[in-house]
Structures are given as structure tokens and as C-alpha cells.
């Protein structure tokens, strides 16, 4: 490690890829928490706090914001012809496809299973424990998250 802290904590705070990614993730989760606060009449502080920290699904997609900001920042720092840009680009495609496809489908199936299980539980008195419903993203949620990530990365890398 040299005197300017190139391997220390200070270096990561000067890293535009890290800054854009962290800011995009935070801003997307903050927007999600704000939407919950404005649309749910009885949203408590616990729900707002949990949304801000780790809730998945909803508007905007923090997954999309994060991976698009990383890819955009890498395009600035390493160039679009670099290996690391190609890696980040395809990583972003996989993450977005998973958030919009696999996770969304799994969440819809879990919701259907829970509905069926609760109905059967009431009808024939079989104990039922609901499965976790994973929340994926819709196309508009992914588009908004992607735009957030892109513009935040542009701002971090050009200002």
C-alpha cells in the first residue's frame, strides 16, 4: 500500500464505479421507500426502514439500477472495448433477466401456492405454512431502475 491509501478505504471512496453503484443502489431503495410511504396510508416506520434496507421487488428496480450504474461507470473508466466492460455488460443482462423473469415467475408461483394452501387448510383443516413470496420486477420497474443507474453513473463519472 502506498502513502495515498491506494489499497485503503479512502481509495474506494475515490472509485467512480463504487460511488455510482452505491449511490444508485441507495437512491433506488430510497425511491422505493418513498413510494411505499406515499401510497400506503398506514406504512409504519418499520416497513419504511425495511424497504430502505433490503426489500426486493417494486418500483424502481434496485437490481437494474445497480448493475447498469456499474456497467456505465466501467465504460467510462475502462472503455467499452475492455474485457471488464464485456463482463459487466453480460452480468447486467443476467441480473436484469433474473429479476424480471425467474424471480418474478417464482414469486407468482409462490403466491398461487399460498392461495391454494390456505384454501385447502380452511376446507379440510390441514396445517399450512405459507412459503416466502419473492418479488421480482415488471418491465417498467426495470426500465426506471436502469435509467436511474445510467444517469447516476453519468453524473458521478462526468462531474
Where are these predicted regions, by residue range?
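Short, strongly hydrophobic alpha-helical membrane anchors
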Residues: 1-12
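N-terminal signal-anchor transmembrane alpha helix
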Residues: 15-33
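Membrane-embedded catalytic cores of phosphoryl/pyrophosphoryl-handling enzymes
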Residues: 26, 47-159
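Membrane-interface helix-loop junction between the first two transmembrane segments
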Residues: 30-48
